[in-house]
């Protein structure tokens, strides 16, 4: 036997190298086969419910880092709730209708208009479901625990029927109406868009300054007067029917030198416009308030048969332009509102593909709307005063990345204005985890217009509306419920497979159809109505979930998307918000803080992270950043996270190894019988437990990460475990001192493994497999630890916190001695302490082996004068010299009692007593040399 074998060196097969890319799929397969998710739900049956409702990602392509961050965050929350006494099933979902899938099929060569509608929809459905399967595997590979066998998918018959019923309740309350309002129109998609489907980019546009001649001045202006207007959309001049002025804005009538014409412009803008138009010596003839110009008639710049009426508009400002806005009610929301209020004609001169129509005039018909500025300028002739190219923020179709226009077309709307206050009142009841989130959603609802819910596309849920022979829309409770039942049985494809009369209840009649003939709506619903109905299709209809849901958690872009549409439909149906709490996340940016883009080559695929580091590192990264704001990710950042993981893993490996001979049932020591330092560490750990439990409760992942890493690196590794080796390696295996420390080790090991489970389930499960005395076969089936309180813990903490301050000073003194080559390692030191009365009382009260705690071979508490050479601090001074004696081959301390023993060992008296007591046979025979 060798001397080294008398040490209690920790033994474990738990590997230092994690091998996560290979091990994670093995664990995931085992969990699936053992039905761990289902068993967790069974364990929690009858407990308080917690419903985190999954916002459905769009089923197209592999998941990206943003998807991963979101789903991992949800998984951490649901796992922590499941381990905290809540019944918290997690039903993942997918959004499956919409234009992107139509575009994919088009790229694959599918000709939509050459196919039967039902056949085309089947192709869309098959593609969508293939993407659901692909993304499901992506999410499972992240270690997300969910009911993967029973997700919700917005194309299933039960979901579509639930969506129709949401629509039906809104129709019943009078919230659904048809109108020809201007809407965001995407010529590239040939469809109306919702606000959530637009994004803003800079665009260079041609802006024109031109003049309308006064036709009837109403006794205020002469007919040789011209009113100057500005437009950034020249094509809309073809449909201009009015000029809007601000009622309280001051306007001036001016005559520039050399001009026979007189002009009206906003007084505030006269100087800048004079420079722009090269007007010199401008004579101001008169001033007017805007309301004095109201109802003056001007003529269209190139069509004298068309009148343009001066009207008042609250949207008019003097921030730019001329202070007068040309009004084309068919091409703008403000234009429409003020135009209709003043009886202006609503004219639309652009078709669904962005092509100018016949009613624009022969010079324009057949041309693309964005290419007609030169024709407009030619038609304006000397009425054109200036032309500029301007760069401004402009709305684009978020899918095709092409600019859009406002265009009045017959559409179906959901009225928000009818119950807006009810929605705002519900927002006040929701718990937001950021105040700016509440303000953002509140302002969006307060300021938004009615919701355009119709789309002129193929792949989606049909609007369940019929038309009588006289074109009266029909959407009664009876007809809508009948359609819902048909969808429930056959899916929405039946809408396209049957004639209208076969979709109506048997024997249905309507006064508008004396001949019994009916037609059906061809438009589909906005996809935001699809996902916005999920509270009904999933949360209400799944018995394991509770409505309203406890939490919605998505990216901050969903304030105008899913958060918004879900809120509107839920309040419209039931008068309540669909969520009790709302939590939003920022976007994942690259390492430089730039937006990720395939074209820039700066994207990081979750699959690449899994191959290089493992999903655990991606999961740990999610907790290491503040996800409420935009976050950065790169392979370098993940390498740093991987290093944190390595430290966590190796620390826990040390605890596993050094409790391998510990049975918590027979060997554990009661708290009151622990040494003071062990009690201190137990109390500090329980403070960590409380902090982490609170952080889980408040979804504060970064707090968990920082608390955990700090505890492991600073309090455990750099303090407790640092000196613990002297005890657990050197003392007798069954000694009280060793068992005291092992009690603390085991308690921390078991509880920290549980605390880590929501974040690092694969690693926690691997650790758990080495804990033979724990009852649950999977750590996921255990409960998170509760923080304990101990008698006199505040006094104990105060004392040991003071010691930690003292320890920091002692370490500085040792470091100085090391720098001066007095010692090498701290174990070579004899540390002499010169304390004041307060520090001396503290050290004596600890009743502990200070040399052991400070990892020195000898320690003296001295009285009397402090030597000149001492390192001085407030309240205490130190001297450091080399300890006397020889190095013990067993404990590595320098000890004056170290000598060669008769059994071939050069060791100190303390180690000799341990060997002679526990290894009598070796003492007799001697150690191997």
From Swiss-Prot:
Gene Ontology process terms (BP): isoleucyl-tRNA aminoacylation
SUPFAM superfamilies listed in its UniProt record: Anticodon-binding domain of a subclass of class I aminoacyl-tRNA synthetases, Nucleotidylyl transferase, ValRS/IleRS/LeuRS editing domain
Residue numbers binding Zn(2+): 888, 891, 908, 911
Primary location group: cytoplasm
Position of sequence motif 'HIGH' region: 57-67
GO cellular component: cytosol
Signal peptide interval: none
Cell compartment(s), UniProt: Cytoplasm
Tree of life domain: Bacteria
Binding locations of L-isoleucyl-5'-AMP: 554
One GO molecular-function entry: tRNA binding
Annotated motif 'KMSKS' region, positions: 595-599
InterPro entries: aa-tRNA-synth_I_CS, aa-tRNA-synth_Ia, Anticodon_Ile_BEm, Ile-tRNA-ligase, Ile-tRNA-ligase_type1, Ile-tRNA_ligase, M/V/L/I-tRNA-synth_anticd-bd, Rossmann-like_a/b/a_fold
Assembly and oligomerization: Monomer.
Record-stated family: Belongs to the class-I aminoacyl-tRNA synthetase family. IleS type 1 subfamily.
HAMAP family: Ile_tRNA_synth_type1
Comment text on domains: IleRS has two distinct active sites: one for aminoacylation and one for editing. The misactivated valine is translocated from the active site to the editing site, which sterically excludes the correctly activated isoleucine. The single editing site contains two valyl binding pockets, one specific for each substrate (Val-AMP or Val-tRNA(Ile)).
Protein name: Isoleucine--tRNA ligase
Organism per entry: Streptococcus thermophilus (strain ATCC BAA-491 / LMD-9)
